[in-house]
Amino acid sequence: MAFNKDQDYWANIFVTPDFLSVETYSGLGMTGRDPLFSPRLLQPDVDDKSLGEEILQALSDSRTLDVLEERVAFFDLEKSKEQYAAWIATLMEKYGYRTKRALFKNMKKVGIHLVNDVITIRPSFHEKLEAWSGNRINESDYVVLPADSSPTEIGSGLRLALSRCKG
């Protein structure tokens, strides 16, 4: 896939023992889940090549929202709350979680950023039920790959980053 120089591409991965969700994020500076692209829900044991292909597609779908009106609409608080609630409801129904606590308890999150032919995969610290941060994560925990890495290498890199998640 071709990625533009000096353009940021974003994705986030959410993982539980029951699923792996590859999600496109868009924005400008601040990013958010892009409602134009449905989460790619995979089995946690998906092969690295397929996983890498889904990550590359999610990154390719990422949009830079450089028009102010577009950003204002994209980050509308009420719409964002509705979309987040729908995301939770979908995951709970599809995977049989009875409570949000059960859904989020063992969930890991990894952020992926691609810019200027470099993919940076950042593990996170699970702060509280629905919150992750970079606290307790060192830059040495990041997985950094060239953008022309094979899908298998990217999938493997994600698994390495997941193993470095904390909390």
Curated annotation (Swiss-Prot):
Immunity protein component of a toxin-immunity protein module, which functions as a cellular contact-dependent growth inhibition (CDI) system. CDI modules allow bacteria to communicate with and inhibit the growth of closely related neighboring bacteria in a contact-dependent fashion. Neutralizes the toxic activity of cognate toxin CdiA-o11-EC869 (the C-terminal 289 residue CT fragment). Does not inhibit toxic activity of CdiA from other toxin-immunity modules or strains of E.coli. Expression of this locus confers protection against other bacteria carrying the locus. Transmembrane segments: none annotated. Interacts with the C-terminal fragment (CT, residues 88-377) of cognate toxin protein CdiA-o11-EC869. Probably recognizes only the toxic DNase subdomain of CdiA-o11-EC869 (approximately residues 222-377). It holds the Pfam family CdiI. Signal peptide: none annotated. This is Immunity protein CdiI-o11.
